[in-house]
């Protein structure tokens, strides 16, 4: 056998999980079992299979074309891209230019910092969470940043209450969407944020049950950053801490592992937490914490190539807050 052909067969078979579109019916039955899926009717099952088949074709194509990342059948594979975005993200777009937070312009070239940096290695990032079908990514990303700020300042990890933001933030729209910097504004207006244990996550809009006596974090000031260079995020990340950023999530839905090189940039719809950066096989990348549980991606994280505005990571101003 030709050595090149043999290499390609081994490479594709290893990296793409050797999915075969002709085996879609068999994969679908395995999917139903593995993810405990049940449908209300035969017509609904057929509808979901057609979506699954379309997603499988996309997964196969991505595994062939984006050779530094791997994509797989996962819990979202019977949902259309629009369904996944509408149910499992939640970033809104501002109707006007809102600058409650102080705007800082960073127009100098990036410093010569370390090639790799990861706040997780310093134990300053809380565990991966799962927002479920509540569109509150904005709350998770913002509070993820505050959790890290608290850990940096007090050397202690604490989980904050996304549910408090969902119920009591009247600037944003709870499970129907919100913004990153306005979430900081809401925490400042409320006077603080409670721990998750005191105000547990329910994944739906509820009545505000604020208890100021149980605030564990209070926000002094918030900032938004204008970056002339995407690489400047490295300096900001090291100096400030993990940063909530906005992305287009449509191309990460079926992600499994690796560095994403090709990622849609058609409109921001999701918020995630930037926690680090590194280099793999000569390709620099960002490390991002998602809110789709540890059974997605790299134990809940994903990586995208730097300096190509992957997933639109540079389209919206990153933000941070200073805590008391």
From Swiss-Prot:
Keywords: Disulfide bond, Glycoprotein, Hydrolase, Protease, Signal, Thiol protease, Zymogen. Its EC number is 3.4.22.50. SUPFAM superfamilies: Cysteine proteinases (SSF54001). One of its GO terms (molecular function) is cysteine-type peptidase activity. Synthesized as an inactive proenzyme and activated by proteolytic removal of the inhibitory propeptide. The active site is at 137, 270, 290. Disulfide bonds join 134-175, 168-208, 263-311. Glycans are attached at residue 159. Residues 19-113 form a propeptide. It catalyses: Endopeptidase of broad specificity, hydrolyzing substrates of both cathepsin L and cathepsin B. PROSITE patterns: THIOL_PROTEASE_ASN (PS00640), THIOL_PROTEASE_CYS (PS00139), THIOL_PROTEASE_HIS (PS00639). GO terms for biological process: proteolysis. It holds the Pfam family Inhibitor_I29. Residues 1-18 form the signal peptide. Cysteine protease that plays an essential role in host liquefaction to facilitate horizontal transmission of the virus. May participate in the degradation of foreign protein expressed by the baculovirus system. Belongs to the peptidase C1 family. This is Viral cathepsin. It comes from Choristoneura fumiferana defective polyhedrosis virus (Cfdef). The lineage of its organism: Viruses, Viruses incertae sedis, Naldaviricetes, Lefavirales, Baculoviridae.
């Amino acid at each position: 056998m030709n050595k090149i052909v043999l290499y390609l067969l081994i490479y594709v078979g290893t990296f793409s999980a050797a999915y075969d579109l002709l085996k879609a019916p068999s994969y679908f039955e395995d999917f139903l079992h593995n993810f405990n899926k049940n449908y209300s009717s035969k017509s609904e099952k057929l509808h979901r299979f057609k979506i699954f088949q379309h997603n499988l074709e996309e997964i196969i194509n991505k595994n062939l074309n984006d050779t530094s990342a791997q994509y797989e059948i996962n819990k979202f594979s019977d949902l259309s891209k629009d369904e996944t975005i509408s149910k499992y993200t939640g970033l809104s777009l501002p109707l006007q230019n809102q600058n409650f937070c102080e705007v800082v312009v960073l127009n100098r070239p990036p410093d010569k910092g370390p090639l790799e940096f990861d706040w997780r290695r310093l134990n300053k990032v809380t565990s991966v969470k799962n927002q479920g079908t509540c569109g509150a990514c904005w709350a998770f990303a913002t509070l993820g940043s505050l959790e890290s700020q608290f850990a940096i300042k007090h050397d202690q990890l604490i989980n904050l209450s996304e549910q408090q933001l969902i119920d009591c933030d009247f600037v944003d729209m709870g499970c129907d969407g919100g913004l990153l910097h306005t979430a900081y504004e809401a925490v400042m207006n409320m006077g603080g944020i409670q721990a998750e244990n005191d105000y547990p996550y329910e994944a739906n809009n509820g009545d505000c049950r604020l208890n100021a006596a149980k605030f564990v974090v209070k926000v002094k000031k918030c900032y938004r950053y204008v970056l002339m260079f995407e690489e400047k995020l490295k300096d900001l990340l090291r100096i400030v801490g993990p940063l909530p950023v906005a992305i287009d999530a449509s191309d990460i839905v079926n992600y499994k592992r690796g560095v994403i090189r090709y990622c849609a940039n058609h409109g921001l719809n999701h918020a995630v937490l930037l926690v680090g950066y590194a280099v793999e096989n000569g390709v620099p990348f960002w490390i991002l914490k998602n809110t789709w549980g540890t059974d997605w991606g790299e134990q809940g994280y994903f990586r995208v190539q730097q300096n190509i505005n992957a997933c639109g990571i540079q389209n919206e101003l990153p933000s941070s807050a200073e805590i008391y």
